[in-house]
Regions:
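Short, glycine-/small-residue-rich phosphate/pyrophosphate-handling segment
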Residues: 10, 14-34
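Short gly/pro/ser/thr-enriched loop/turn and capping motifs at secondary-structure boundaries
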Residues: 6-7, 49-51, 115-117
């Protein structure tokens, strides 16, 4: 799966994989127009890799602008050359891991991590403050839906593009009222989730 947040979203939209509505922006002025014209709460993401710290969940339009400005001002180097503004979706997060041989996959136990720095899900996101496995909210029905709607279409897309990927695929998901949605892909284990799975 691509390491760019923008390309991940584009792949999801193209293959009807459930994800959040998004906008890609390449300047602060472009971002401000979207931030001030939309009525839905937004999440701000650096487009490239940022060690799990490139996501901001602002509480206001002003915080949204400040987060976007900090990314464009070089907070994450070249990973912040483009910014993704994303619809803020609600629900608990869950991490699902698949080991892929290029064609087939096997699932590992699910996990839930806690990213916020402070208690009661407050403060900035971190690389991970703690985790547990398996994720109790991931019922058999949800897992079947995740396999059908997210995991298999993702693996099929890699195969269609002749991407012979061998390794772990980390599906960062949010369980919303309308079902599971992709919030991120990674080609690595999550940390600290991996510690609880092992």
């Amino acid at each position: 799966p691509p390491t760019s947040s923008r390309r991940q979203r584009q792949m999801c939209i193209r293959d009807s994989i459930p994800t959040a509505k998004f906008w890609k922006v390449s300047s602060l002025e472009e971002a401000k127009k979207i931030i001030h014209s939309t009525s839905i709460p937004l999440v701000v993401k650096a487009d490239g890799l940022a060690s799990g710290k490139g996501v901001f969940i602002p509480d206001s339009k002003e915080e949204c602008v400040r987060a976007t400005e900090s990314i464009f001002n070089g907070k994450f180097g070249n990973s912040g050359n483009m910014v993704v503004l994303e619809e803020k979706i609600h629900g608990p997060e869950v991490s699902v891991f698949a080991l892929c041989d290029g064609k087939k996959y096997i699932l590992l136990p699910s996990a839930q991590d806690h990213k916020r720095l402070n208690e009661e899900d407050k403060g900035p996101n971190t690389g991970g403050m703690g985790a547990y496995s398996p994720a109790p909210l991931l019922t058999k029905n949800y897992l079947e839906r995740i396999i059908k709607e997210i995991i298999e279409p993702t693996i099929n897309e890699l195969n269609k593009k002749n991407i012979d990927y061998k390794g772990v695929i980390y599906f960062g998901l949010m369980i919303t009222k309308s079902g599971p949605k992709v919030i991120e892909y990674n080609c690595r284990f999550g940390d600290p989730e991996c510690q609880t799975i092992m």
